[in-house]
């Protein structure tokens, strides 16, 4: 709960409307009080990603940020997508990078400028499974009142949890002592 409050406080400024982030925080507290229904890792990851979206950092989860190729729909994913991690999430671009663009490009565009340092660009991407992408899409567009109303198998959770945490920390441009403490309790 302290980590969630710290993250919300970091993203809220006096000049902005803080009603959505704090409504999200209240919904998280309610979900935590009913934690028998949802695992803590799911609540944490969903909160991290949803906090980013309500604060104006909606990730591009519908297509590749490099070539614009639209991803397969959640309702009918193609076979290649189900059997492998076809897309990667770029923290620098705040969105997906398809397998073809990731493999073909010697340097991913970083904020519209090509980088000569390929290792640097690729270090800021992470592979996404279909389940993680589906969960991220749901959380990003769901109303605040329903942001945890989905299921994700524990074996599929690592991509989603890592994406949400890394995205929030990347946008915050800092770590949180309360997150370190939370991780020490595991």
What are these regions (language model features)?
Residues 1-186:
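Non-catalytic alpha-helical scaffolds and adjoining flexible linkers that form interface surfaces
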């Amino acid at each position: 709960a302290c980590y969630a409050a710290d993250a919300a406080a970091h993203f809220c400024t006096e000049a902005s409307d803080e009603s959505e982030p704090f409504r999200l925080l209240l919904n998280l507290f309610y979900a935590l009080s009913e934690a028998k229904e949802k695992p803590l890792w799911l609540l944490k990851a969903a909160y991290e990603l949803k906090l980013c979206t309500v604060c104006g950092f909606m990730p591009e989860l519908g297509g590749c940020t490099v070539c614009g190729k639209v991803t397969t729909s959640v309702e009918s994913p193609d076979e290649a997508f189900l059997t492998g991690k076809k897309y990667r999430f770029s923290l620098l671009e705040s969105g997906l990078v398809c397998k073809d663009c990731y493999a073909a490009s010697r340097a991913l565009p970083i904020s519209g400028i090509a980088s000569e340092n390929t290792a640097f660009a690729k270090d800021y991407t992470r592979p996404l499974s279909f389940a993680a992408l589906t969960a991220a899409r749901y959380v990003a567009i769901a109303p605040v009142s329903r942001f945890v109303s989905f299921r994700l198998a524990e074996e599929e959770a690592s991509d989603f949890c890592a994406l949400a945490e890394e995205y929030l920390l990347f946008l915050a441009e800092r770590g949180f002592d309360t997150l370190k403490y939370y991780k020490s309790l595991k």
